[in-house]
Amino acid sequence: MIKSDELAKLVDTIEERFNKKITSNKAIYSLKNSTLHYYQFKEFGQTAVDIITNDNNLIDNIYALYLEPPLPSTVFPNRDVETFGSLQGDIEAWWSIYWHPFWGRLSLEKKKHYVEQKNLSNELKEFLLLHN
């Protein structure tokens, strides 16, 4: 899952690597010995992108973009942060699949910096730092 304003960076990186425009939500691209399976879809009302590739340089380039998923308050706008609780149901699925791979790679110091840089409620800051 990717923030909507970061999708263009991802697409540009892929298009540059494979010298082709992404024109649909599902695509397979090949260039020399590199192959990419690209699938863009909606989940939890947000854009998700599934990428399978054997191109290590592309993986490194995507990793260097420091893409991040949308915040829980964006994905679940009609829920009070206090109802997120112990990560059950759809919140647990979203957390495990989309948020934790991003959040888990940050040190505690970087997590603290992240929540301070965002315009988050105190409850959301506390929730994110609690689920370290």
Place the predicted regions along the sequence by residue.
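Polar/charged low-complexity regulatory segments
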Residues: 1-132
